[in-house]
Amino acid sequence: MNIIDRFEQENISKRTANKKIPDFEAGDTVKVTVKIIDRSIEKDGKEKLTERFQAYEGVVIAKRNRGITSSFLVRKISHGEGVERRFMTYSPIVHSIDVVKYGVVCRAKLYYLRNRSGKSARIKERHIPIAKTKAAKA
């Protein structure tokens, strides 16, 4: 293992120390909670920073596993328009990742969903036995 790989592994372990990243893949529906920092200037000229959390729920259409620069692309339909957002897996901005539904797909990248709407854009649900999910949570 060279120096760069060791540095990446140390960084990944530091960033995942206080949060758990579940196993998910393309086709799964995830809920990503993101930390948003709002900056405003008060009347007296002082700068005020406020933090809030925002949830983004959608289907993972691509996942890129590249060490510390790993990312995944989530697509959702908002007010009739398709919205895609790429999240860095180990970013400090990503507060939590929860898998809502597991999907069954035969592709690693689901870019074809961009051209589909309605029933043709649906993904079959993969059912996982209750014993496995309870053991994973414990």
UniProtKB/Swiss-Prot annotation:
One of its GO terms (biological process) is translation. It comes from the Bacteria. InterPro entries: Ribosomal_bL19 (IPR001857), Ribosomal_bL19_sf (IPR038657), Translation_prot_SH3-like_sf (IPR008991). This protein is located at the 30S-50S ribosomal subunit interface and may play a role in the structure and function of the aminoacyl-tRNA binding site. Keywords: Ribonucleoprotein, Ribosomal protein. This is Large ribosomal subunit protein bL19. It holds the Pfam family Ribosomal_L19. GO terms for molecular function: structural constituent of ribosome. Belongs to the bacterial ribosomal protein bL19 family. GO terms for cellular component: cytosolic large ribosomal subunit.
